[in-house]
Each structure stands twice: as structure tokens, then as C-alpha cells.
């Protein structure tokens, strides 16, 4: 994978450890994608409820960001929820 700020046209972003996702062919930090989103359709992992994740097919758990100004959460799959949610919260607070 490639780090945040780099192109993700051919190679995926480093996701789990760094908290980056591909948007408009560039890797961005997940909380930046969520903060700048105008609608939930701006990224396939944005959500406002667990049902949104299920409907989009991107998981079944919508994790909110600690920053209350970010109105969208991030979808995760329940089987990895404990590990991923912990990392999601840690990345959102420290970055």
C-alpha cells in the first residue's frame, strides 16, 4: 500500500495502520474525508447509522469520529469491529 497524500490509482492506500482511504485517486486520512464530505455518497465507507453500512454493503457497524463536528461515521465489518474500531478512534484522536 501507499501512504496518505500519495496517488492511489494503481496501488491501494495503507488503511488499517495509518487510517487512509482512496478518494478522487488520492489517499486521504479517513477523518478528513468524513469532515469534508457534503453527502454520505462522497465515499463508500461514510455512514450515519449501522443500516447505512449494511445498505452500502461496506460493513454492519457505523463508528462515529470523536470530533462532534464530523457528521458522518465510518463503516466497519462486525467481525473485525473490536480491532478496527479501537484503531479508528486512536487515529482520529491522535491525528
UniProtKB/Swiss-Prot annotation:
Its biological purpose: Probably participates in a plant defense mechanism. Active against Gram-negative bacteria E.coli ATCC 700926 (MIC=1.1 uM), K.pneumoniae ATTC 13883 (MIC=2.7 uM) and P.aeruginosa ATCC 39018 (MIC=4.7 uM). Has hemolytic and cytotoxic activity.
Tissues expressing the protein: Expressed in flower, stem, shoot, root, leaf, seed, pod and nodule (at protein level).
Pfam family, any one: Albumin_I_a
Taxonomic source organism: Clitoria ternatea
Cross-link Cyclopeptide (Gly-Asn), where in sequence: 1-30
InterPro entries, per the entry: Albumin_I_a, Cyclotide, Cyclotide_bracelet_CS, Cyclotide_sf
Name of the protein in its database record: Cliotide T1
Keywords in alphabetical order: Antibiotic, Antimicrobial, Cytolysis, Disulfide bond, Hemolysis, Knottin, Plant defense
Family recorded in the similarity comment: Belongs to the cyclotide family. Bracelet subfamily.
Record propeptide residues: 31-95
Domain-level remarks: The presence of a 'disulfide through disulfide knot' structurally defines this protein as a knottin.
Post-translational modification: Contains 3 disulfide bonds. This is a cyclic peptide.
Species classification: Eukaryota, Viridiplantae, Streptophyta, Embryophyta, Tracheophyta
Disulfide bond listed as a keyword: yes
Highest taxon in the source lineage: Eukaryota
Disulfide bonds: 4-20, 8-22, 13-27
GO biological process assignments: defense response to bacterium; killing of cells of another organism
Amino acid at each position: 500500500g501507499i501512504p496518505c497524500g500519495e496517488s492511489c490509482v494503481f496501488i491501494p492506500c495503507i488503511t488499517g495502520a495509518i487510517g487512509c482511504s482512496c478518494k478522487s485517486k488520492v489517499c486521504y486520512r479517513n477523518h478528513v474525508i468524513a469532515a469534508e464530505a457534503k453527502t454520505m455518497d462522497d465515499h463508500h465507507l461514510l455512514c450515519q447509522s449501522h443500516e447505512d453500512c449494511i445498505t452500502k454493503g461496506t460493513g454492519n457497524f457505523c463508528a462515529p469520529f470523536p470530533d462532534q463536528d464530523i457528521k458522518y461515521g465510518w463503516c466497519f465489518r462486525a467481525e473485525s469491529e473490536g480491532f478496527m474500531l479501537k484503531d479508528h478512534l486512536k487515529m482520529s484522536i491522535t491525528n
